[in-house]
Amino acid sequence: RDVAPSRGLGDVYKRQKIEDPFWGHMQELVTDVVIPFQEDVLNDRQPGVEKSHAIENFKIAAGLSQGEFYGMVFQDSDVAKWLEGVAYSLIIKPDAALEKRADDIIDIIAAAQQPDGYLNTYFTIKEPEHRWQNLLECHELYCAGHMMEAAVAYYEATGKDKLLKVMEGMAGHIIDRFGPDKLPGIPGHQEVEIGLMRMYHATGNE
């Protein structure tokens, strides 16, 4: 059933301002240094840092690039956490260029989503026949939860719901496959729970 969505964290952040010099400086470091650095890492543009391939994995899964999956099974979560960080950064320090780059990455993520709603670059590229077969170790629900959190944060920060719609599709895919008389099992790493909760708070859809 549908219920009225509750106030999200974006509203809380918009009403608050850090004035303490120490924590204010930490906040500036995140917006001005950490987020740009991590963006370069995710795009394999940072010299002297181990290749991430995280954005490239999404491009390959979307059919926008050729190649093999590289990284850990949970590599997608790095992109999700960067997008969530960008969302909170945009609330306190609007940046049209950064927002446009985030929008472009969201377009790639949306293109990587499979027709049945599934979203995970490792299994889409490397082992499509083994989806949902190793919940304890393969982090599919973990990655989904982080991307759900990113989708909600970005929606609350910008009003743009493209990633939110993508993750509603993934949530529907999960619901179709788990539950009574469906796939049994529990995730090996908590995260999808808070992702689903935040999706509910943002959309009101159970």
Q: Model-flagged regions — what are they?
A:
Residues 10-206:
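Glycan-recognition and catalytic cores of secretory/periplasmic carbohydrate-active enzymes
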